[in-house]
Amino acid sequence: MACLAIAALGAWYAASFINPAQLTKLLSSSVKESTGRDLKITGPVSLSLFPSISVKAEQISIGNASWASNPNFLTFKQIELDISIWPLLSGNVEINRIGVSGLEMNLQTNKAGEGNWNLTPPALAASSPPNQASNSSSTGSTFVALKTLDVMDARISYQDVNQAVKVINLPKASIGNSYGKATINIDAQYANYTLNLKGKSGSIRNTYFAWGQAPVKMDLDLILTLNGKSLAITGEVDKQPQTMAQFKINLNSKSFDLAPLAGSAVVAGAAGKAGPTTTHQAQGKYFFSDDALPFDMLPLADGSIKIDIAELGVPDQAPFTNFKTTLQFKNDRIDANDLSFNVGKGKAQGQLSISEFSSPSPKISFRGMAKDFSLEQIVPLTDSHARVSGAATQVAWNVKGSGISPHQFVSRASGAIQVSVGQGALDAKFINKGGDFVITVFDAVNPLYKKSTQTTLECAVAYLPIKNGIVNIKDSVGFVTDRLNIVLSGSINLNSEALDINISPTEKSGLTTGIDLGGLVKVEGTLQNPQVGVNKTGVVNSAVSIGLGFLTGGLSIAAENAKSLATKVQPCKTALHSWSDIYPTGN
């Protein structure tokens, strides 16, 4: 009781000379010293003594970077600070807990790639021993004793230069620090996605203050739940001063979807930017997006991330199963040499490499093969009018290129891709999902396509050699349906995305009326806006045949029919190349 009375007396004594206006001034100067930003409190400030000294303030703001569009980096409807008594007597503010409601955080980057969240961190005392630097509470920094952060009803907006604003809502978030450990429980919402991150890690506060100045070891034991599916994150991070961070992380899940994560990872990972990034002015006119990929969020580090997901959700198709790989990080290079997963009843394997990702033009290469599956096995059954039956499929790819965006990458790419599809039946709506280019091709070769509900496919092969962003198709794309043999030739410029594709369909009977309407057609325009044009060479050839038919009383037409019957076209066999030339066996 005596100790309690003494503590209460000390609290009363400390509070007896605390003037809210003076405390506001002290807090403002402390924030300015710690962050380089101005703190303003325009609402009422109140003080309570028990169970600890607590200051509650309303309508608070912290200033933004000078170049930012919003004058405030942070605003709060209300903030409550639990303050340590004894440091206060000597003129220092040490905060054990911060409770926040109605938080608005405005994150933004400028044209130089700088983020407005780059606050000036307090420097650790040079005289502190390394093993004490991350745990000492006597450095004189304002928030060094912060143990708990509770946030309610928060809204975080992020805007990259020349991009639309992205918004994350935090209904609640709590981060507690005790005995060198952090307890984390965060609920977040982004677009149609809900996220919860829960678990324990090394002290976030200690890691922040000691990073790059003292040795840091941070263990991770977290559960990320995304739209009801959970991913276990375990491992450790080791950072020594003047050296690159090292880490070993494991990601394990019974079932997880990566599609929602892609939408929120860019925003959530933005706080991990270490400095200026390469700017890129995107153009929205391309089929392959010209928006910059978030290479600047990849860590410059040495380490590995081992991924083991039993069922991986993939957009618009059945999930992959037994998805496994290990990402190896080495400076600004990432390699995945053991990528494997099951697709349908088949298997896929491959390798991926990203290098020089801190440069203006990262290099990317990927190769692999998927086989022993069918389109029927991977097409979801959500739409009864877009079904597929059969269609055994094999795919191989070996492509390398460079660039900051998908468009830059394909415009500089070289390599080859091959797809082979066997006998099957394709609903019209399934074909329509192939996009404008596929629909344009089918319309061109079969004017009755729109009136039919299903296409009977005997085979289809597409071999696409790529050299410096140019796809040259020389009878290397072929289709065979129950009625037609179809061969495509021409080119695709992946830089301009211009199309120059000639279509050569013939009746499987080998008979012709003398006028090959398909031979008169070509696909022009761009991948984003394909159009049907006129094949001038086909027009000339057809005109000659028609003219000769009139002159010879139909003998030239009969000759064409005889020639067609004698030389049967085999589009798939002609188009197919050796699989080992694309993805050598044994890889």
Where are these regions (language model features)?
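Amphipathic hydrophobic-ligand
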Residues: 36-40, 66-83, 95, 162-175, ...
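Short loop/turn motifs that connect adjacent beta-strands in outer-membrane beta-barrel proteins
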Residues: 88-92, 360, 406-411
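Extended terminal
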Residues: 1, 12, 215-225, 229-231, ...
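Secondary-structure transition motifs
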Residues: 37, 58-173, 245-300, 424-452
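Elongated, acidic membrane-bridging lipid-handling scaffolds
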Residues: 124-217, 283-329, 457, 466-468
